[in-house]
């Protein structure tokens, strides 16, 4: 579903940061200021968000993986919820340095988590002493919190979707190093450099974050549905061709 200007206004997407904290590189996307707060030009944001959705749609249609990143308190739950709805990996607790640039190490931790989860399923906890079980539960909880959202990510993602580039500077830097496209919400106090698909907007409002994350998840689901429809249509076309030549 396409996001409208009205939805953006209602979610407060246009509210930037205090003028004294601004990044001059965001000047092209700023409409003006009110009460020492920068106002983002939604006439720029809307088409840029639409472009980002279009890219996401195409990537999803080609079975691409998009990693959702949002670890701030106001975005944590939404990021997990929308990524799961779209069947995509996510990081919503803390970005561990090297999550992409040192994927081999991450794979070791993922294997450990999966082995531990399998042990729980097999009833191994019941065979442990109280102390062993407690330490085991603590470790599995820690792993689930830090890497649970990426445990089914088979490799480096095809793109990352980030809410707040300043807060997730390491994630953006890692993506840039590997040539992984970055789709990101950039507020008036940060630089849009290193971002392939810039979404100029408020990165603090939970309503705004929900709007972006839902929009990206919707685009992923639409892209997948379109790909399935194309396969069905192609199969029908082949059937008709066979009948005509029978």
Swiss-Prot record:
Pfam families membership: Ribosomal_S2 (PF00318)
Cellular component aspect of the GO annotation: cytosolic small ribosomal subunit
Keyword Glycoprotein: no
Any GO molecular function: structural constituent of ribosome
Family designation: Belongs to the universal ribosomal protein uS2 family.
This protein's encoding gene: rpsB
Record InterPro entries: Ribosomal_uS2, Ribosomal_uS2_bac/mit/plastid, Ribosomal_uS2_CS, Ribosomal_uS2_flav_dom_sf
Keywords: Ribonucleoprotein, Ribosomal protein
GO BP annotations listed: translation
HAMAP family: Ribosomal_uS2_B (MF_00291_B)
Organism: Burkholderia ambifaria (strain MC40-6)
Listed PROSITE patterns: RIBOSOMAL_S2_1
Protein name: Small ribosomal subunit protein uS2
């Amino acid at each position: 579903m396409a996001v409208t200007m009205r939805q953006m206004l209602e979610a407060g997407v246009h509210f930037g940061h205090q003028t004294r904290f601004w990044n001059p590189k965001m000047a092209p996307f700023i409409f003006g200021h009110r009460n020492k707060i920068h106002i983002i030009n939604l006439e720029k944001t809307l088409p840029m968000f639409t472009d980002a959705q279009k890219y996401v749609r195409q990537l999803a249609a080609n079975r691409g993986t998009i990693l959702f990143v949002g670890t701030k308190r106001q975005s944590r739950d939404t990021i997990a919820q929308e990524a799961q709805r779209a069947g995509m990996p996510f990081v919503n607790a803390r970005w561990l340095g090297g999550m992409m640039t040192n994927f081999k190490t991450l794979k070791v931790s993922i294997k450990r988590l999966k082995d531990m989860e399998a042990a729980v399923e097999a009833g191994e906890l019941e065979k442990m002493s109280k102390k062993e079980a407690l330490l085991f539960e603590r470790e599995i909880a820690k792993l689930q919190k830090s890497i649970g959202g990426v445990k089914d990510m088979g490799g480096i993602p095809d793109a990352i979707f980030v809410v707040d580039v300043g807060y997730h500077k390491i994630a953006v830097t890692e993506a840039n190093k590997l040539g992984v496209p970055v789709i990101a919400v950039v507020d008036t106090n940060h630089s849009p450099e290193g971002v392939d698909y810039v979404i100029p907007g408020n990165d603090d409002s939970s309503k705004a974050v929900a709007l972006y994350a839902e929009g990206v998840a919707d685009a992923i689901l639409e892209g997948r549905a379109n790909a399935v429809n194309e396969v069905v249509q192609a199969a029908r076309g082949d059937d008709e061709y066979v009948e005509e030549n029978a």
